[in-house]
From Swiss-Prot:
Coiled coil: none annotated. One of its GO terms (cellular component) is SLIK (SAGA-like) complex. This is SAGA complex/transcription factor TFIID complex subunit TAF9. One of its GO terms (molecular function) is transcription coactivator activity. Residues 1-29 are annotated as: Disordered. InterPro entries: Histone-fold, TFIID-31, TFIID_subunit_9.
Length: 157
C-alpha cells in the first residue's frame, strides 16, 4: 500500500486473495469495474471472487436493457397520437421500472408474520402413527383395495 491509498482485497476462483487498489494499474481496469470495487469497499466488503464485479455489471446491463425496452414499448403505446419523432421520456422509464418491480423483485413476508403463520399451522397436531409392522396404507376409502375392480371387459373374454 503505497501513497496512503486504500487497497481492496478480492478472492479469485482458486481461493487465493488478490489485491486491487491504487497500486494496481488503473489503465488496465475498466472504469465500471473500478467503481464496483469502490462500491464494495464502501460497504466493508473486502474479500470476494474476481467474477463478482462482472456478474454485477452483467445484471446491471440486462436490467437496464430490459427497462429501456419496456419504456420504448410504453412510449410507443402512449405516443400513438403524438408525432413519430417523440423521444423516450423520464415518465416512460419510471413506468417501466415500476412495472418491472411488480413482477421481478418479490418481497418476502416479514419474519414475524411467517412465525405467526407457522405457529397457527402447528397448533393442529399430526395424526398418530400406528405401531404396526408392514406397509402403511392410506385410509381404506383412498385405496384401490377397497373394492373389487374389474379392469377388463367381461364381454371381450
Amino acid at each position: 500500500m503505497n501513497g496512503g491509498g486504500k487497497n481492496v482485497l478480492n478472492k479469485n476462483s482458486v481461493g487465493s486473495v488478490s489485491e486491487v487498489g491504487p497500486d494496481s494499474t488503473q489503465e488496465e481496469t475498466p472504469r465500471d469495474v473500478r467503481l464496483l470495487h469502490l462500491l464494495l469497499a464502501s460497504q466493508s466488503i473486502h474479500q470476494y471472487e474476481d467474477q463478482v464485479p462482472l456478474q454485477l455489471m452483467d445484471f446491471a446491463h440486462r436490467y437496464t436493457q430490459g427497462v429501456l425496452k419496456d419504456a420504448l414499448v410504453y412510449n410507443d403505446y402512449a405516443g400513438s397520437g403524438n408525432s413519430a419523432g417523440s423521444g423516450l421520456g423520464v415518465e416512460d422509464i419510471r413506468l417501466a421500472i415500476a412495472a418491472r418491480t411488480q413482477y421481478q423483485f418479490k418481497p418476502t413476508a416479514p419474519k414475524e408474520l411467517m412465525l405467526q403463520l407457522a405457529a397457527e399451522r402447528n397448533k393442529k397436531a399430526l395424526p398418530q402413527v400406528m405401531g404396526t409392522w408392514g406397509v402403511r396404507l392410506p385410509p381404506e376409502k383412498y385405496c384401490l383395495t377397497a373394492k373389487e375392480w374389474d379392469l377388463e371387459d367381461p364381454k371381450s373374454m
